[in-house]
A protein has these predicted regions:
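Terminal, low-structured helical/coil segments at or just beyond the last alpha-helical repeat
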Residues: 208, 217-219, 223-269
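Structural motif corresponding to the intra-repeat A-B loop/turn of tetratricopeptide repeats
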Residues: 102, 136, 170, 175, ...
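TPR alpha-solenoid repeat register
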Residues: 91, 125, 159, 198, ...
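Canonical tetratricopeptide repeat
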Residues: 94, 128, 162-163, 201-202, ...
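Extracytoplasmic and endomembrane cell-envelope/extracellular-matrix remodeling and assembly machinery
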Residues: 1-155, 183, 228, 265-269
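Residue-level recognition of tetratricopeptide repeat
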Residues: 97, 131, 165, 169-172, ...
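Canonical positions in the second alpha-helix
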Residues: 114-115, 148-149, 187-188, 222, ...
Length: 269
Protein backbone atom coordinates (compact mmCIF):
# COMPACT_ATOMS: atom_id res chain seq x y z
CA UNK A 1 0.00 0.00 0.00
CA UNK A 2 2.81 2.38 0.90
CA UNK A 3 4.51 1.68 -2.40
CA UNK A 4 1.31 2.64 -4.20
CA UNK A 5 1.19 5.85 -2.16
CA UNK A 6 4.72 6.73 -3.28
CA UNK A 7 3.76 6.10 -6.89
CA UNK A 8 0.66 8.24 -6.46
CA UNK A 9 2.62 11.12 -4.96
CA UNK A 10 5.16 11.00 -7.77
CA UNK A 11 2.40 11.22 -10.33
CA UNK A 12 0.97 14.25 -8.57
CA UNK A 13 4.43 15.80 -8.41
CA UNK A 14 4.43 15.89 -12.20
CA UNK A 15 1.89 18.69 -11.84
CA UNK A 16 4.74 20.99 -10.78
CA UNK A 17 5.82 21.13 -14.42
CA UNK A 18 2.40 22.30 -15.60
CA UNK A 19 1.00 25.83 -15.64
CA UNK A 20 -1.23 26.47 -12.64
CA UNK A 21 -4.33 26.54 -14.87
CA UNK A 22 -3.59 22.98 -16.00
CA UNK A 23 -2.75 21.54 -12.58
CA UNK A 24 -5.22 19.17 -10.97
CA UNK A 25 -7.47 20.58 -8.27
CA UNK A 26 -6.14 17.98 -5.85
CA UNK A 27 -2.57 19.16 -6.39
CA UNK A 28 -3.48 22.82 -5.85
CA UNK A 29 -5.14 22.02 -2.50
CA UNK A 30 -2.64 19.28 -1.44
CA UNK A 31 0.84 20.51 -2.42
CA UNK A 32 3.36 17.69 -2.74
CA UNK A 33 6.95 18.24 -1.72
CA UNK A 34 10.07 16.20 -2.33
CA UNK A 35 10.41 15.84 1.45
CA UNK A 36 7.05 14.11 1.79
CA UNK A 37 7.92 11.64 -0.97
CA UNK A 38 11.35 11.04 0.55
CA UNK A 39 9.87 10.45 4.00
CA UNK A 40 7.34 7.95 2.71
CA UNK A 41 10.02 6.16 0.66
CA UNK A 42 12.23 5.87 3.76
CA UNK A 43 9.38 4.47 5.87
CA UNK A 44 8.64 1.94 3.15
CA UNK A 45 12.27 0.80 3.09
CA UNK A 46 12.37 0.49 6.89
CA UNK A 47 9.10 -1.44 7.10
CA UNK A 48 10.66 -4.61 5.70
CA UNK A 49 7.66 -5.11 3.44
CA UNK A 50 8.72 -6.64 0.15
CA UNK A 51 6.91 -5.58 -3.00
CA UNK A 52 4.67 -8.26 -4.48
CA UNK A 53 6.09 -9.54 -7.73
CA UNK A 54 3.57 -9.78 -10.56
CA UNK A 55 2.60 -13.24 -11.74
CA UNK A 56 4.40 -13.42 -15.08
CA UNK A 57 2.06 -16.07 -16.47
CA UNK A 58 -1.01 -13.96 -15.71
CA UNK A 59 0.67 -10.90 -17.18
CA UNK A 60 1.51 -12.82 -20.35
CA UNK A 61 -2.04 -14.14 -20.68
CA UNK A 62 -3.40 -10.65 -20.10
CA UNK A 63 -1.19 -9.25 -22.86
CA UNK A 64 -2.42 -11.95 -25.25
CA UNK A 65 -6.03 -11.24 -24.38
CA UNK A 66 -5.55 -7.50 -24.96
CA UNK A 67 -3.90 -8.17 -28.31
CA UNK A 68 -6.73 -10.41 -29.50
CA UNK A 69 -9.40 -7.96 -28.41
CA UNK A 70 -7.55 -5.10 -30.06
CA UNK A 71 -7.39 -7.03 -33.32
CA UNK A 72 -11.11 -7.80 -33.26
CA UNK A 73 -12.45 -4.51 -31.92
CA UNK A 74 -9.98 -1.91 -33.21
CA UNK A 75 -7.98 -3.47 -36.07
CA UNK A 76 -6.94 -0.04 -37.32
CA UNK A 77 -5.03 0.57 -34.07
CA UNK A 78 -2.90 -2.57 -34.24
CA UNK A 79 -0.16 -1.00 -36.38
CA UNK A 80 0.04 1.89 -33.90
CA UNK A 81 0.42 -0.50 -30.97
CA UNK A 82 2.77 -3.16 -32.38
CA UNK A 83 5.62 -2.95 -34.86
CA UNK A 84 4.95 -5.03 -37.97
CA UNK A 85 8.22 -6.89 -37.38
CA UNK A 86 7.39 -7.66 -33.73
CA UNK A 87 7.43 -11.46 -33.48
CA UNK A 88 6.06 -11.76 -29.95
CA UNK A 89 2.87 -13.76 -29.52
CA UNK A 90 0.64 -10.75 -28.67
CA UNK A 91 1.85 -8.81 -31.72
CA UNK A 92 1.50 -11.72 -34.14
CA UNK A 93 -1.96 -12.51 -32.78
CA UNK A 94 -3.09 -8.90 -33.05
CA UNK A 95 -1.92 -8.67 -36.67
CA UNK A 96 -3.52 -12.01 -37.58
CA UNK A 97 -6.90 -10.98 -36.17
CA UNK A 98 -6.71 -7.45 -37.58
CA UNK A 99 -5.90 -8.76 -41.07
CA UNK A 100 -8.78 -11.22 -40.75
CA UNK A 101 -11.13 -8.40 -39.75
CA UNK A 102 -9.91 -6.34 -42.70
CA UNK A 103 -10.45 -9.28 -45.12
CA UNK A 104 -6.73 -9.40 -45.91
CA UNK A 105 -6.55 -13.14 -46.56
CA UNK A 106 -2.87 -13.36 -47.42
CA UNK A 107 -1.67 -11.51 -44.33
CA UNK A 108 -4.21 -13.14 -42.00
CA UNK A 109 -3.13 -16.63 -43.08
CA UNK A 110 0.57 -15.76 -42.91
CA UNK A 111 0.25 -14.31 -39.41
CA UNK A 112 -1.98 -17.04 -37.98
CA UNK A 113 0.36 -19.72 -39.34
CA UNK A 114 3.24 -17.87 -37.68
CA UNK A 115 1.23 -17.79 -34.46
CA UNK A 116 0.65 -21.55 -34.59
CA UNK A 117 4.36 -22.01 -35.23
CA UNK A 118 5.20 -20.10 -32.05
CA UNK A 119 3.06 -22.42 -29.90
CA UNK A 120 2.13 -25.53 -31.89
CA UNK A 121 0.54 -27.22 -28.86
CA UNK A 122 -1.85 -24.35 -28.13
CA UNK A 123 -5.32 -25.57 -29.18
CA UNK A 124 -6.76 -22.07 -29.34
CA UNK A 125 -4.29 -20.94 -31.99
CA UNK A 126 -5.28 -23.90 -34.15
CA UNK A 127 -8.92 -22.96 -33.46
CA UNK A 128 -8.24 -19.38 -34.60
CA UNK A 129 -6.52 -20.72 -37.71
CA UNK A 130 -9.54 -22.91 -38.39
CA UNK A 131 -11.85 -19.92 -38.14
CA UNK A 132 -9.71 -17.81 -40.46
CA UNK A 133 -9.32 -20.59 -43.03
CA UNK A 134 -13.07 -21.28 -42.96
CA UNK A 135 -14.13 -17.70 -43.48
CA UNK A 136 -11.82 -17.40 -46.47
CA UNK A 137 -13.33 -20.58 -47.95
CA UNK A 138 -10.30 -22.79 -47.33
CA UNK A 139 -12.33 -25.62 -45.83
CA UNK A 140 -9.79 -28.44 -46.07
CA UNK A 141 -7.20 -26.35 -44.23
CA UNK A 142 -9.86 -25.32 -41.73
CA UNK A 143 -10.77 -28.95 -41.16
CA UNK A 144 -7.14 -29.87 -40.44
CA UNK A 145 -6.75 -26.93 -38.04
CA UNK A 146 -9.91 -27.77 -36.10
CA UNK A 147 -8.95 -31.45 -36.00
CA UNK A 148 -5.66 -30.50 -34.37
CA UNK A 149 -7.40 -28.15 -31.93
CA UNK A 150 -9.87 -30.89 -30.96
CA UNK A 151 -7.07 -33.40 -30.51
CA UNK A 152 -5.29 -31.02 -28.15
CA UNK A 153 -8.48 -30.08 -26.28
CA UNK A 154 -10.99 -32.92 -26.76
CA UNK A 155 -13.38 -31.80 -24.01
CA UNK A 156 -13.79 -28.24 -25.27
CA UNK A 157 -17.37 -28.05 -26.50
CA UNK A 158 -16.95 -24.89 -28.57
CA UNK A 159 -14.01 -26.35 -30.48
CA UNK A 160 -16.00 -29.55 -31.08
CA UNK A 161 -18.96 -27.55 -32.43
CA UNK A 162 -16.76 -25.51 -34.77
CA UNK A 163 -15.01 -28.66 -36.01
CA UNK A 164 -18.34 -30.42 -36.59
CA UNK A 165 -19.63 -27.40 -38.51
CA UNK A 166 -16.74 -27.65 -40.98
CA UNK A 167 -17.32 -31.39 -41.43
CA UNK A 168 -20.99 -30.75 -42.18
CA UNK A 169 -20.67 -27.82 -44.61
CA UNK A 170 -17.67 -29.19 -46.52
CA UNK A 171 -18.84 -30.61 -49.85
CA UNK A 172 -15.92 -33.05 -49.70
CA UNK A 173 -17.33 -34.68 -46.55
CA UNK A 174 -18.92 -38.11 -46.84
CA UNK A 175 -21.19 -40.17 -44.60
CA UNK A 176 -18.32 -41.06 -42.25
CA UNK A 177 -17.54 -37.36 -41.79
CA UNK A 178 -21.17 -36.59 -41.01
CA UNK A 179 -21.23 -39.40 -38.44
CA UNK A 180 -18.04 -37.99 -36.91
CA UNK A 181 -19.71 -34.57 -36.74
CA UNK A 182 -22.70 -36.09 -34.94
CA UNK A 183 -20.38 -37.77 -32.46
CA UNK A 184 -18.60 -34.47 -31.82
CA UNK A 185 -21.86 -32.59 -31.34
CA UNK A 186 -23.45 -35.15 -29.05
CA UNK A 187 -20.29 -35.11 -26.98
CA UNK A 188 -20.47 -31.32 -26.72
CA UNK A 189 -24.01 -31.29 -25.30
CA UNK A 190 -22.70 -31.80 -21.76
CA UNK A 191 -20.64 -28.59 -21.83
CA UNK A 192 -22.86 -26.55 -24.18
CA UNK A 193 -26.43 -27.65 -23.37
CA UNK A 194 -27.92 -24.24 -24.23
CA UNK A 195 -26.34 -23.93 -27.66
CA UNK A 196 -29.05 -23.63 -30.32
CA UNK A 197 -26.32 -23.82 -32.96
CA UNK A 198 -25.34 -27.28 -31.71
CA UNK A 199 -28.86 -28.66 -32.20
CA UNK A 200 -29.25 -26.98 -35.57
CA UNK A 201 -26.01 -28.63 -36.73
CA UNK A 202 -27.17 -32.02 -35.43
CA UNK A 203 -30.40 -31.61 -37.39
CA UNK A 204 -28.43 -30.67 -40.50
CA UNK A 205 -26.10 -33.66 -40.19
CA UNK A 206 -28.97 -36.11 -39.71
CA UNK A 207 -30.81 -34.48 -42.60
CA UNK A 208 -27.83 -35.04 -44.88
CA UNK A 209 -27.81 -38.68 -43.78
CA UNK A 210 -31.51 -38.92 -44.75
CA UNK A 211 -32.53 -39.60 -41.14
CA UNK A 212 -35.56 -37.33 -41.04
CA UNK A 213 -36.94 -38.37 -37.61
CA UNK A 214 -33.67 -37.53 -35.86
CA UNK A 215 -33.36 -34.30 -37.85
CA UNK A 216 -36.86 -33.29 -36.71
CA UNK A 217 -36.07 -34.24 -33.11
CA UNK A 218 -33.06 -31.93 -32.97
CA UNK A 219 -34.98 -29.13 -34.68
CA UNK A 220 -37.52 -29.59 -31.89
CA UNK A 221 -34.69 -29.28 -29.35
CA UNK A 222 -33.62 -26.04 -31.01
CA UNK A 223 -37.18 -24.69 -30.88
CA UNK A 224 -37.40 -25.70 -27.20
CA UNK A 225 -34.28 -23.68 -26.36
CA UNK A 226 -35.79 -20.72 -28.20
CA UNK A 227 -38.94 -21.04 -26.06
CA UNK A 228 -41.06 -21.68 -29.16
CA UNK A 229 -43.51 -24.17 -27.65
CA UNK A 230 -45.83 -24.59 -30.68
CA UNK A 231 -42.90 -25.34 -33.00
CA UNK A 232 -41.38 -27.65 -30.40
CA UNK A 233 -44.58 -29.68 -30.25
CA UNK A 234 -45.07 -29.76 -34.02
CA UNK A 235 -41.54 -30.97 -34.75
CA UNK A 236 -41.46 -33.48 -31.89
CA UNK A 237 -44.79 -34.93 -33.09
CA UNK A 238 -43.34 -35.40 -36.57
CA UNK A 239 -40.15 -36.93 -35.15
CA UNK A 240 -41.81 -39.47 -32.87
CA UNK A 241 -43.56 -41.18 -35.77
CA UNK A 242 -40.26 -42.50 -37.07
CA UNK A 243 -38.43 -43.14 -33.80
CA UNK A 244 -38.11 -46.58 -32.24
CA UNK A 245 -40.70 -46.92 -29.49
CA UNK A 246 -39.26 -46.70 -25.96
CA UNK A 247 -35.87 -45.62 -27.27
CA UNK A 248 -34.10 -42.72 -25.56
CA UNK A 249 -34.94 -40.46 -28.50
CA UNK A 250 -38.60 -41.56 -28.47
CA UNK A 251 -38.91 -40.67 -24.78
CA UNK A 252 -37.25 -37.31 -25.39
CA UNK A 253 -39.76 -36.54 -28.14
CA UNK A 254 -42.56 -37.46 -25.72
CA UNK A 255 -41.13 -35.03 -23.16
CA UNK A 256 -41.01 -32.24 -25.73
CA UNK A 257 -44.59 -32.92 -26.82
CA UNK A 258 -45.70 -32.85 -23.17
CA UNK A 259 -43.91 -29.53 -22.66
CA UNK A 260 -45.70 -28.04 -25.68
CA UNK A 261 -49.10 -29.32 -24.49
CA UNK A 262 -48.55 -27.93 -20.98
CA UNK A 263 -47.55 -24.57 -22.43
CA UNK A 264 -50.69 -24.51 -24.60
CA UNK A 265 -52.92 -25.42 -21.65
CA UNK A 266 -51.35 -22.71 -19.48
CA UNK A 267 -52.11 -20.06 -22.10
CA UNK A 268 -55.81 -21.01 -22.08
CA UNK A 269 -56.17 -20.42 -18.35
Amino acid sequence: KKKKNVSFLKKLQDNELLPETQQSEYYRTHPITRNRISALTTRLAQSGVKPVQPNLHWKDQHNRMKAKLLGFLSPQQVSWTYDDHDNTIPAVMAYAVAAYQNSDEKKAVRKVEALVGLEPDNPYYHELAGQIYADFGRLEESRAAYAKAHKLRPKDGLIAIAYAHILIVNDQSGASDLKEAIKLLRGAIASEPRSTRLYRLLATAYGKLKNDPMAKLYLAEEAYLKRNAPETGRLASLAIRGLAENSQEWHRAKDLIFYAEQHKAAKKR
